[in-house]
């Protein structure tokens, strides 16, 4: 198999990407990354033909478009910064558009009772932790299907699990730390169903490095016949993220049940769904500014827009802050200290950039002086010019002085009295350019705190440049 000549690929790079303040060495590395990524995951046939240098055509461009469409990126056929960012993420080694084909059609196990064997163990974890991680991964799939799984200690099992490194004689060598973490084969005889984990990775049972339970649950989905999902919230999404609780999204459940049917449980499990930025029914749990940007939070996810990138960025909260819980209920930025404070229940966390500050979480009672009757905060914002922070709880609000570190006297007050027209409850709020933006359900109210008037009423997701709401 031949490679595209490096000079031609660099010419391709110069034509299809915008100017980067990067060294020639960096560009060469990125060109090599693009070629290898598309060959491995998008079946790019590297036959040595010249890449078109002046038109958006040719095999590399078409495969780039295919990859960008799969990951929900802006489809340009150009190796832009967002595309390279995705390519550099650790991920599963199974291709996105061509499975490890062993049999024609849609492979599945004919029997519902399957066996598995762990052939060897990683030294990164105690054996009991490895056993537990793999067992829990199988349970995720058995909970939603008629499938059952039994661990055996010797002989040939339906699904053989091993920790290997480099070239391990399956025509899909591992690449060292990072990059390709693991892979598994679709159901079938011999190597079919087997799962291999790269021993050059550091496997853990927490959010650090690579969580074995999380990766195993994904790979076993392949062992059962699933391919990759384009849903970023699905366990079968190809890139690795750890979002705290490892669970099947509804997309995963729908996929596996399409192959094996529903479980025999009287109550059918339901998985979380990934929010869609332009869903007219979209609501938010919390919103805050952070260093000039606005971040929107929903369940396990954050959403944000970037003036340099028109697409809405959607990802797990844990990508930025792995120590924060999912389902945040309120957030606000205190710019004077470059802090953002996140609330859930009666606890809150303070972060600077991507770092959760030492000593958190703390409780809202000793820190802010809330009465014990307050069980959680619905929404919060802080006025940068006054140091006053507003906390909205049910139909009332408190005002806190950040500099005196105490509640202002005379509070709580009624929301409806001091913020006429926005209703009795606030789901989320933030301040930008001197205006308060209140959110309740699918509605957003732009409020002028000086005149105490609502200026505009829009859909909650109006910040996302959706064509239709």
Swiss-Prot record:
EC number(s) recorded for this UniProt protein: 3.4.24.7
Sites marked Cleavage: 269-270
Binding-site residues for Ca(2+) 2, renumbered to this chain: 158, 190, 192, 194
Compartment(s) of residence: Secreted, Extracellular space, Extracellular matrix
Post-translational modification summary for this protein: Undergoes autolytic cleavage to two major forms (22 kDa and 27 kDa). A minor form (25 kDa) is the glycosylated form of the 22 kDa form. The 27 kDa form has no activity while the 22/25 kDa form can act as activator for collagenase.
Chain positions found as Phosphothreonine: 274
Residues the entry annotates as binding Zn(2+) 1: 168, 170, 183, 196
Catalyzed reactions: Cleavage of the triple helix of collagen at about three-quarters of the length of the molecule from the N-terminus, at 775-Gly-|-Ile-776 in the alpha1(I) chain. Cleaves synthetic substrates and alpha-macroglobulins at bonds where P1' is a hydrophobic residue
GO cellular component, one term: extracellular region
Alphabetized UniProt keyword annotations: Autocatalytic cleavage, Calcium, Collagen degradation, Disulfide bond, Extracellular matrix, Glycoprotein, Host-virus interaction, Hydrolase, Metal-binding, Metalloprotease, Phosphoprotein, Protease, Repeat, Secreted, Signal, Zinc, Zymogen
List of residues that carry Phosphotyrosine: 360
Binding-site residues for Ca(2+) 3, renumbered to this chain: 175-176, 178, 180, 198, 201
Hemopexin repeat residue intervals: 275-324, 325-371, 374-422, 423-466
Cofactor(s) it depends on: Ca(2+); Zn(2+)
One of the record's GO molecular function terms: serine-type endopeptidase activity
Phenotype upon changing residue 360 to F: Partial reduction of tyrosine phosphorylation in the presence of PKDCC/VLK
Active site: 219
List of residues binding Zn(2+) 2: 92, 218, 222, 228
Function: Cleaves collagens of types I, II, and III at one site in the helical domain. Also cleaves collagens of types VII and X. In case of HIV infection, interacts and cleaves the secreted viral Tat protein, leading to a decrease in neuronal Tat's mediated neurotoxicity.
UniProt note: domains: There are two distinct domains in this protein; the catalytic N-terminal, and the C-terminal which is involved in substrate specificity and in binding TIMP (tissue inhibitor of metalloproteinases).
Protein name: Interstitial collagenase
Organism listed in the record: Homo sapiens (Human)
High-level lineage: Eukaryota, Metazoa, Chordata, Craniata, Vertebrata
Gene that specifies this protein: MMP1
């Amino acid at each position: 198999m031949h490679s595209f000549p490096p000079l031609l690929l660099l010419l391709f790079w110069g034509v299809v990407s915008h100017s980067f303040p990067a060294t020639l060495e960096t560009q060469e590395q990125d060109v090599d990354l693009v070629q290898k990524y598309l060959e491995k995951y998008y079946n790019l046939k590297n036959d040595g033909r010249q890449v078109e240098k002046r038109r958006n055509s040719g095999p590399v461009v078409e495969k780039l478009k295919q990859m960008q469409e799969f990951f929900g990126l802006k489809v340009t056929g150009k190796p832009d910064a967002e595309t390279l960012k995705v390519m550099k993420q650790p991920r599963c080694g199974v291709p996105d558009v061509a499975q490890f084909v062993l049999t024609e059609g849609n492979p599945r196990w004919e029997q519902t009772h399957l066996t598995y064997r762990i052939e060897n163990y990683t030294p990164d974890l105690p054996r009991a932790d490895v056993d537990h991680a793999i067992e829990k991964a199988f349970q995720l799939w058995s909970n939603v299907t008629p499938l059952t799984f039994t661990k055996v200690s010797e002989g040939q099992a339906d699904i053989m699990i091993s920790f290997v490194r480099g070239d391990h004689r399956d025509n899909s060598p591992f690449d060292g730390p990072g990059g390709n973490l693991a892979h598994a084969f679709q159901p079938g005889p011999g190597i079919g169903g087997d799962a291999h984990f790269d021993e050059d990775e550091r496997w853990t049972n927490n959010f650090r490095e690579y969580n074995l339970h999380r990766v195993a649950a994904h790979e076993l989905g392949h062992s059962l016949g699933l391919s990759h999902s384009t849903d970023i919230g699905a366990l079968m999404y190809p890139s690795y993220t750890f979002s705290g609780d490892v669970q099947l999204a509804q997309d995963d459940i729908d996929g596996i049940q399409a192959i094996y049917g529903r479980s025999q449980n009287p109550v059918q499990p339901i998985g979380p769904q990934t929010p869609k930025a332009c869903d007219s029914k979209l609501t938010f749990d919390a919103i805050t500014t952070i260093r000039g940007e606005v971040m929107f939070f929903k369940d396990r996810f954050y959403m944000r827009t970037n003036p340099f990138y028109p697409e809405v960025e959607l990802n797990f909260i844990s990508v930025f802050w792995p120590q924060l819980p999912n389902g945040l209920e309120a957030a606000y930025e205190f710019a004077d200290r470059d802090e953002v404070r996140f609330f859930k229940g009666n606890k809150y966390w303070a972060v600077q950039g991507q770092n959760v500050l030492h000593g958190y979480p703390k409780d809202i009672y000793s820190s802010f002086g809330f009465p014990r009757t307050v069980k959680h905060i619905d929404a919060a914002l802080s006025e940068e010019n006054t140091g006053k922070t507003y906390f909205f709880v049910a139909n009332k609000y408190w005002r806190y002085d950040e500099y005196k570190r105490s509640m202002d006297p005379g509070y709580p007050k009624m929301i409806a009295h001091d913020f006429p027209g926005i209703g009795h409850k606030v789901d989320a709020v933030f301040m930008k350019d001197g205006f308060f933006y209140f959110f309740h359900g699918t509605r957003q109210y732009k409020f002028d705190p000086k005149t105490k008037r609502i200026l505009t009423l829009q859909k909650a997701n109006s910040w996302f440049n959706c064509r239709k709401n």
